[in-house]
Amino acid sequence: PLDSYECHHGIGYSRFLSSKNGLKADLLAFVPVNSTCEINKLTLTNTTDAPKTFSLFSYAEFCLWNAVDDSTNFQRNLSIGEVEIEGSTIYHKTEYRERRRHYSFFSVNSPVDGFDTSRDVFLGMNNGNAFPAAVKENKAGNSVASGWYPIASHQINITLSAGESKDFIFILGYSENPQDQKFVAPNVIRKDGAHKIPVSYTHLR
């Protein structure tokens, strides 16, 4: 269990504070006005008098664009998941080539030490969200989903000096492209919209 936990909900935002073994986490979550994304700003603080080294894992599971169909049509859905990875951003592009012009993405403003896009690899077979295999082993699988359950997870290895804090900004976003401008190369989606969104929030403090 955590050593402490607080949850605050305000107008247009939620904030979650927790601590464990001298590590404090402060998560601010909100959806900006007139933007197709959710911002999660995480501040980690070492409250001890000694350096602390640990790994941070993010996690988001993508839907396949139709909630009812996602939960029923498994013989089809489990064969269509598709992703791209570019730096610290994971793109979900299921059915983008065939019949869609929109995609979603999950990014972080930091270099990553690993990633996963397959839920089975990240969680482990027949495992749940309580203790994912990647977290247990402290090692992401660098999996690239092809079908099954596409997710986005980043691994970031961190060392904080005594009293040091570090901010991470995670963005879960959505973007669309004109029908005739969907790709920049074979099987490489146009990412202009996704590239613009993080730039708008580099000022967050």
Where are these regions (language model features)?
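Short glycine/proline/serine/threonine-rich loop/turn segments at secondary-structure transition edges
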Residues: 178-180
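Short Pro-Gly-centered flexible turn/kink motifs
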Residues: 52, 158-176
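Trp/Gly-enriched beta-strand surface patches
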Residues: 1, 6-24, 76-162
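A short, sequence-level motif marking secondary-structure junctions
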Residues: 30-33, 97-98, 110-111, 174
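Acidic, contiguous internal or C-terminal segments within carbohydrate-active enzymes
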Residues: 20-64, 159
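Conserved small/polar residues in nucleotide/adenosyl-binding loops
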Residues: 202-203
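An exposed, glycine/acidic-rich loop-and-rim segment of catalytic or binding clefts
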Residues: 55-91
